[in-house]
């Protein structure tokens, strides 16, 4: 990635955002949030929700960058949308590891509206990168993304429960409202960057889980 950054120097993340916008031919603005989406393009990944909500998404003051490959119907849909909304939406319909890293590091938010997701890695990457995830509450997403609570100011992302495009838009709007409050937003970013996904921690959790299961039998 163009610029390394940490929870202590979040400003450097903007260097990656600028590079990302330029790479995809979008006009860079610090104030306009970029929503990243890296996914296999299938219904199970919630792409039908994205398709259904697309016009509403394009009405928001955002830019969306998608990388992925999959179902032909989604390839043709996103190709059409990229030519219809060239200032707001860009896509790379294939896989490219370097671009995937740049999207993770340069986006402000990461969208993962999966129908089901046994584990999910992209939300973990995005948390580590300080790219705030907006996910559906399912499987591994529910385990790793904690819905931000405005009263307690705790949480590391945004979560919607019902598999529904309106619910997804509603939670996205809540995230975008908080994006305008830089202090709160950086708090959410830092909360995600502090999460430890190392195998050591995961292994300990599994061992505890097995002990619990065995002792209850």
Which role does the model predict for each range below?
Residues 1-217:
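Catalytic cores of carbohydrate-active enzymes across secretory and cytosolic contexts
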């Amino acid at each position: 990635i163009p610029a390394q950054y940490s929870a202590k120097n979040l400003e450097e993340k903007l260097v990656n955002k600028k590079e990302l916008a330029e790479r995809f031919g979008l006009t860079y603005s610090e104030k306009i949030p970029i929503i990243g989406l890296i996914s296999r393009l299938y219904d199970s990944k919630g792409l039908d929700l994205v398709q259904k909500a697309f016009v509403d998404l394009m009405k928001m003051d955002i830019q969306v960058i998608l990388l992925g490959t999959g179902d032909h119907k989604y390839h043709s849909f996103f190709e059409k949308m990229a030519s219809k909304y060239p200032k707001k939406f860009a896509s790379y319909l294939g896989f490219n590891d370097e671009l995937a890293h740049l999207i993770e590091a340069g986006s402000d938010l990461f969208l993962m509206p999966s129908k089901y997701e046994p584990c999910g890695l992209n939300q973990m990457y995005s948390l580590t990168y300080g790219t705030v995830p907006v996910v559906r509450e399912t499987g591994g997403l529910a385990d790793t993304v904690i819905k931000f609570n405005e009263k307690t100011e705790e949480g590391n992302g945004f979560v919607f429960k019902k598999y529904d495009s309106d619910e997804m838009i509603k939670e996205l709007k809540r995230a975008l409202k908080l994006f305008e409050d830089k202090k709160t937003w950086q708090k959410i970013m830092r909360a995600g960057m502090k999460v430890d996904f190392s195998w050591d921690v995961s292994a300990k959790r599994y061992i505890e889980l097995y002990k619990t299961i065995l002792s209850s039998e």
